[in-house]
Amino acid sequence: MRFKIRGPLIQLRYKSTKAFYITTPIFYVNAAPHIGHLYSMLIADTRNKWEKLNPSKESFMLTGTDEHGLKIQSTAEKLGLEPKVLVDKVSQNFSKLAEQFDVNYDRFIRTTDNDHIELVRYFWNLMMEKGFIYTDTHSGWYSISDETFFPETQIEEVVKNGKAVKISSETKNEVVYQEETNYFFKLSMFQEQLIQFLKQNPEFIKPKHRYQFILKELEDTKLPDLSISRPSSRLKWSIEVPNDSTQKIYVWFDALLNYLTATKFPHGFEVQDSKFVTPENSIWPATHVIGKDIIRFHCIYWPIFLMAAGIELPKQVIVHSHWLCDGFKMSKSLGNLVDPMEISEYYGVDPVRFFLVENSNIDDDCKFSEELLQRSRDAVLGKYCNLISRIGGKNFSIEEAVKSFASGEFNNIREIIETYTINKDSVEGLLSSLNKLTTDLNDLYNQMDHYFTNFDYIRAIQCWWSVINQANQIFQSAEPWTYVKLINSPETPAELKEKYRILNNYFVYLCAETTRISSILIQPVMPQLSKKILDRLNVSGRTSEFTTLSADLQYGSGANSKSHKVPLEKIAPRDIK
């Protein structure tokens, strides 16, 4: 089968290593972006940036917009616009959202892109050739909002504005009964194969209760074949079915294929025994990040489409929950949508990023409020930024402290602490705290890597907070500023001044190392703020191999200059009444 590309090919730069490939859902352009869209982006972007933090790894992130379908057609008609004009405008809102929040995608895909449209046609013809598509009359309950049919078992009747209407029990959107001739995909042929795959790959869907939900549904309910086209008389804004102008391709059949489009499929994929062999240098298979409301499309339809084509299945599907505002899912009808662009103007981009990642509980719905966001921002300012403020003052020298370590002045630091620490009652506790912090700092990358790669972002950030809190506590307990006073006192003997200088430099050095290492490791979450602090420290090594104690001994020059501004300004709670 010939495959033509009318648009420019995306040049994938991965040659020698297998890149990690992560995707967001492509966002439907019938409305403006909200915090939920940003959340999906940030889950993927954080993991993408984390992978790239390790110079031995490569990563590719895909995001974009879903631009076909009846909802867009209807919205365009109401606005008096051509659908393409509408999607061009709204798609920019999503790319601007990514730009505003430092989401470093490798491709922003649009389902109106030429290479994607060609891929959809190719895939349709492939399924036709394999005998998995047929025509039939279809009747059932159709939701315009969800652009899908629902079985009778998922329909309930409610009263709206004094009138009885049918709705989907899953999405709560209104449905209407329709009968029409469509093309169908033989989902039912692959039900047992998908069940066996899921049983053999229990980590395919994360978290576990989402995996169990899909597996139970497949085991308990016979899959109906899927209607994958709509009459052109009703749906005009979609990709035309090859060789049949009376039908348009169902939006989800079109949309899901975007993940393959970005891989340049089928180019480079060899066919062996009716299956496509993934090239060694291909970014495929993908790790998909999706919201729980589209789990069936990604965990039932999509794997079956790939099975039918003979293509390797995705690596994993990460299903996140929703953000609640005042206990309710954010929605346009409730008027509780949060505009991420607006809140970032007040709180800043990185504090919003950090709040969403720090509270990224994919198992359950997350609670959003500006009070919680303010509290999170204050913690970043008062703990993380406070470290550089403490050691970056005029009484200390980070550069001298780093040089003290390099020259071996801390080789006998335990003995010096035991002998010359002013508060003798706190020596044992201080030594114990120092041992724990140095151990935790050396293991911080491994700990965070474990949690980030398992999409347990909350625990990754907890590990990060732990060393920040320990360093602040040690600085407060050790009181290095008292040694500065003693060093400057004419009454202090020269020998003691030297010991106090070493003690002072050691505590400054340990806090500087905590700041350096923690700043490198928080770059995937707070890229702007971490850059400011690393710039102030004059750190050049900013990748994972520099995230152990003393891995970098060439920083600190100018860090204590009076010219530095605070990395994050304190702000008052916003009056949102």
Swiss-Prot record:
InterPro entries: Met-tRNA_synth, Met-tRNA_synth_2, Methionyl/Leucyl_tRNA_Synth, MetRS_core, Rossmann-like_a/b/a_fold, tRNAsynth_Ia_anticodon-bd. This is Methionine--tRNA ligase, mitochondrial. One of its GO terms (molecular function) is methionine-tRNA ligase activity. CDD domains: MetRS_core. It is an enzyme of class 6 (ligase). Keywords: Aminoacyl-tRNA synthetase, ATP-binding, Ligase, Mitochondrion, Nucleotide-binding, Protein biosynthesis. Signal peptide: none annotated. SUPFAM superfamilies: Anticodon-binding domain of a subclass of class I aminoacyl-tRNA synthetases, Nucleotidylyl transferase. A motif ('KMSKS' region) lies at residues 329-333. Pfam families: tRNA-synt_1g. GO terms for biological process: methionyl-tRNA aminoacylation. It catalyses: tRNA(Met) + L-methionine + ATP = L-methionyl-tRNA(Met) + AMP + diphosphate. Its EC number is 6.1.1.10. The keyword Lyase does not apply. GO terms for cellular component: mitochondrial matrix. A motif ('HIGH' region) lies at residues 25-37. It is found in: Mitochondrion matrix. It comes from the Eukaryota. ATP binds at K332. Belongs to the class-I aminoacyl-tRNA synthetase family.
